[in-house]
């Protein structure tokens, strides 16, 4: 999922706050800029304050993400290296330095020892768990990946909304599918569902953001039998590389069904856009025309867990983010609404209309449907 940081202008308190993960609670760039200044002031008072270093780095990292920097991949974090260098001078044996040294490497496995050292210093710090999940995915060590996915879930802080959302993504897929994702919230919950609950372990999740690692893509091309292309030779045009990878995976020799999550930007799927069919919270790739309405009915009416869209029994720690993600339900829901309306099936039409209105309201998409669905 592409993280957005566009919010109404607001004035924030001039005090240091613990910077929450941007994937759970995205804030406007002004917030991160102000927090960077506040934490810098704390460091000027005490340059041994590990917590201040942690939040100072995180605020600056999120400023870079929110600024829509054109530099992608690990290189976009080079400008944060000076912060890491200063941390090494002042708090080299801290959890914060070792964890952020790894994080700033952009999943460079030659720096994995820093992540391991951070974990050894404080194995209860939850923010390291996703990094272990990613690192072991790169290493293609599924047993260790699942171990840390379970540790993460056991902490009790994984968003239930994203677990439900990604459960429904998995329910959109045929057996033995390959699913292409792009972000954190459309990938990690899938691995947690597979590891913790054994749900749809037949599905192979491939995050497009990870396919810039030469060894990883080489390993995956052998495992899934699609044509290998070296990302290092395509570094100057990352978008073309991603498109090329999507095309190659779609034509894998194992003939495994291929899907893209709705969270994948269409710029990545341009080469196969005419061969993608909406089947729920994913698009199915098929060279032959398929009856996707029948698949939508089956998936959304028989397999999806949708009650969480209607009622929440407790606060979701990723409330802002999951509400935005839930807007992805609107297109498949409207597709079924149109189908039933044309078929003059009034009860089904009304049921989907009510859910569409509710989801649109909760996700801030009322303007999107106001002229389409009449109250």
Each model region followed by its residue ranges:
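Bacterial Sec-dependent N-terminal signal peptides
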Residues: 1-18
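ER/secretory pathway lumenal C-terminal domains and tails of membrane proteins involved
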Residues: 14-168, 172-175, 195-375
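Short His-Asn-centered micro-motif
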Residues: 180-184, 208
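Phosphate- and divalent-cation-binding pockets in alpha/beta enzyme and binding domains
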Residues: 188-189
């Amino acid at each position: 999922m592409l993280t957005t940081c566009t919010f109404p202008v607001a004035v924030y308190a001039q005090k240091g706050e613990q910077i929450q993960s941007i994937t759970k609670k995205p804030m406007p760039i002004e917030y991160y800029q102000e927090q960077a200044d506040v934490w810098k002031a704390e460091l000027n008072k005490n340059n041994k304050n590990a917590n201040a270093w942690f939040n100072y780095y995180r605020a600056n990292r999120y400023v870079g993400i929110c600024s829509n920097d054109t530099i992608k991949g690990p290189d976009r974090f080079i400008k944060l290296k000076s912060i890491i260098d200063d941390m090494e001078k002042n708090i080299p044996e801290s959890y914060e330095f070792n964890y952020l040294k790894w994080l700033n490497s952009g999943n460079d496995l030659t720096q994995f020892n820093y992540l391991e050292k951070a974990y050894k210093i404080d194995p209860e710090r939850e923010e390291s768990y996703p990094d272990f999940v990613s690192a072991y995915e790169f290493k293609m060590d599924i047993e260790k990946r699942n171990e840390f996915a379970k540790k993460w879930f056991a902490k009790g802080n994984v968003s239930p909304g994203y677990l439900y959302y990604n459960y429904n993504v998995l329910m959109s897929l045929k057996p033995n599918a390959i699913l292409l994702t792009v972000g954190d919230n459309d990938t990690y919950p899938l691995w947690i569902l597979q590891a913790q609950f054994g749900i749809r372990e037949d599905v192979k999740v491939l995050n497009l953001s990870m396919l810039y690692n030469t060894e990883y893509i080489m390993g995956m091309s052998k495992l899934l039998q699609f044509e290998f292309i070296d990302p290092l030779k395509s570094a100057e045009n990352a978008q073309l590389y991603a498109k090329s990878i999507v095309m190659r995976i779609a034509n894998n020799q194992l003939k495994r069904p291929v899907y893209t999550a709705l969270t994948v930007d269409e710029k990545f799927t341009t080469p196969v856009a005419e061969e993608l069919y909406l089947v729920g919270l994913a698009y199915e790739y098929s060279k032959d025309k398929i009856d996707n309405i029948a698949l939508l009915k089956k998936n959304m009416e028989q397999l999806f867990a949708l009650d969480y869209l209607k009622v929440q029994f407790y606060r979701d720690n990723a409330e802002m983010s999951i509400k935005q993600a839930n807007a992805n339900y609107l297109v498949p829901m409207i597709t079924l609404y149109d189908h039933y309306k044309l078929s003059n099936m009034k009860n089904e039409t009304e049921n989907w209309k009510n859910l569409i209105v509710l989801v649109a309201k909760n996700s801030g998409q009322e303007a999107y449907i106001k002229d389409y669905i009449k109250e």
